[in-house]
């Protein structure tokens, strides 16, 4: 395909946002590093070139990570080293109080706090909640034979997974769901280039600050107490708001990466029966499927950086103050790294080399949780159903799908995803899942309990989807 990248505004073009593959492939073949002419942003699609940026946080600041192609600062960025001036004007950058926009040494101290909350031991303890919650939600959805997957399952699941990880009492879960459901301000990466200076995560700060202060006065020996008493690497006790921001950052990751990963994964499974059959025959392939999905459809397409000093990427020289956009979604299609990159291959040996979770000091700390959520959700869906399909009523027939995608140059995901399903008889899926030694039901009874609902049975907007009207504010965890 021939195109003129100088004629395409990657940040506002709705066609490219809906289907960026032709743009990605052309840029990889001709311009793996490209300075686009309208804003002067250096767009990096090449895998190795993106890795080079990730490896040098002393050169490339993350302060503009959740911003846009244009910097809105009251001062001109001039000089050979912008490190001090960027921190001086940090308040002018979106999500400036979030970990993803921090540079060392501030990033080092705060990330240490975060990693203390998501230890391997705590993730292991979280597994039972993930399994139990997946079944609880599927108990609600599968008997209907249809659902709007994003709002009725994925969003609730992603939020509650983080809530349990942080030790939020279950009686507070409905409050958190309601708190994170309301849209405030424009979406990050919107095609109108509107910048939101409202941080949706601030709604969580008061909640966690109150919990932290209470636990410091009266330790309870629970997870929240451990979080409240966590210290920086030098042994100092952080201000409660710093800990609250760290906790909120995990919710941001759930609201973005995990939510969209679940939607993208289910869309592919439901739309590609060959892949669905392959996974049903061997659910041990589900983790590989997830990595291949992340490679070819990164939920967070790109991440901004800002040069603090003079630098070069490939053969392109960059002055201090240059905005750089790393496109993870394109890097996953780099033929220098991934053979036949346009093919979806569940058995791909190096799929996990993708950059969907970033690299270096800003590697997504919630990646293990995101992977676990996707694995448990997909396995339980496959075990508890005989067939999952895209609702043709809502999304059109196969080959002519009308997806309801996020209108964003930064995110890849579904606003809504309507599915129909055939539920497996309870005794059959429990036996298949290995959760109990259960005899298979007689064939006639099994047929009676296995129900399929046509797409026509789907309402245009399910009651729960309507109750969740207004998309949640996209938060600050742009990978």
Please describe what each predicted stretch is.
Residues 1-433:
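Cytochrome P450
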Residues 433-457:
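Short alpha-helical segments that sit at the start of domains
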Residues 465-478:
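Short acidic, hydrophobic short linear motifs in intrinsically disordered regions
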């Amino acid at each position: 395909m021939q195109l003129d990248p100088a004629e395409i505004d990657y940040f506002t073009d709705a066609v490219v946002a809906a289907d960026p593959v032709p743009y990605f492939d052309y840029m990889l073949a001709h311009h793996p590093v490209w300075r686009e002419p309208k804003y002067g942003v250096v767009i990096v699609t090449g895998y190795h070139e993106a890795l080079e940026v990730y490896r040098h946080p002393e050169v490339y600041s993350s302060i503009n990570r959740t911003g846009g192609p244009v910097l809105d600062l009251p001062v001109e960025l001039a000089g050979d080293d912008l490190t001090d001036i960027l921190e001086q004007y940090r308040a002018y950058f979106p999500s400036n109080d979030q970990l993803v926009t921090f540079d060392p040494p501030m990033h080092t101290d705060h990330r240490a706090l975060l990693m203390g909350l998501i230890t391997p031991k705590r993730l292991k303890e979280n597994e039972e909640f993930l399994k139990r919650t997946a079944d609880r939600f599927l108990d609600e959805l599968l008997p209907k034979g249809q659902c709007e997957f994003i709002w009725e399952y994925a969003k609730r699941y992603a939020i509650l997974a983080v809530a349990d990880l942080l030790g939020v009492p279950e009686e507070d879960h409905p409050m958190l769901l309601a708190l994170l459901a309301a849209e405030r301000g424009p979406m990050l990466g919107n095609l109108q280039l509107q910048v939101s200076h409202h941080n949706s995560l601030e709604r969580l700060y008061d909640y966690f600050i109150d919990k932290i202060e209470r636990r410091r006065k009266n330790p309870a020996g629970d997870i929240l107490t451990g979080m409240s008493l966590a210290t920086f690497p030098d042994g100092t006790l952080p201000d409660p708001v710093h800990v609250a921001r760290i906790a909120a950052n995990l919710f941001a990751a759930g609201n973005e990466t995990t939510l969209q990963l679940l939607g993208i994964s289910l869309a592919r499974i439901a739309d590609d029966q060959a892949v669905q059959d392959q996974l049903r025959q061997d659910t041990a392939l589900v983790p590989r499927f997830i990595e291949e999905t992340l490679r070819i459809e990164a939920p967070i397409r790109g991440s901004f950086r800002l040069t603090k000093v003079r630098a070069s990427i490939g053969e392109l020289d960059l002055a201090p103050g240059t905005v750089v956009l790393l496109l993870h979604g394109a890097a996953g299609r780099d033929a220098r790294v991934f053979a036949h990159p346009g093919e979806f291959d569940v058995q791909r040996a190096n799929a996990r080399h993708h950059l969907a979770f970033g690299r270096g000091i800003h590697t997504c700390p919630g990646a293990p949780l995101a992977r676990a959520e996707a694995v448990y959700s997909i396995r339980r869906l496959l075990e508890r159903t005989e067939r999952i399909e895209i609702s043709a009523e809502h999304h059109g027939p196969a080959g002519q799908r009308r997806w309801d995608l996020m209108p964003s140059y930064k995110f890849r995901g579904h606003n809504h995803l309507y599915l129909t399903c055939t539920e497996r008889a309870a005794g059959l899926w429990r036996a298949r899942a290995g959760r109990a030694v259960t005899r298979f039901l007689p064939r006639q009874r099994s047929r009676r309990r296995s129900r399929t609902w046509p797409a026509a049975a789907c309402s245009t907007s399910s009651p729960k989807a309507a109750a969740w009207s207004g998309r949640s504010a996209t938060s600050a965890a742009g990978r």
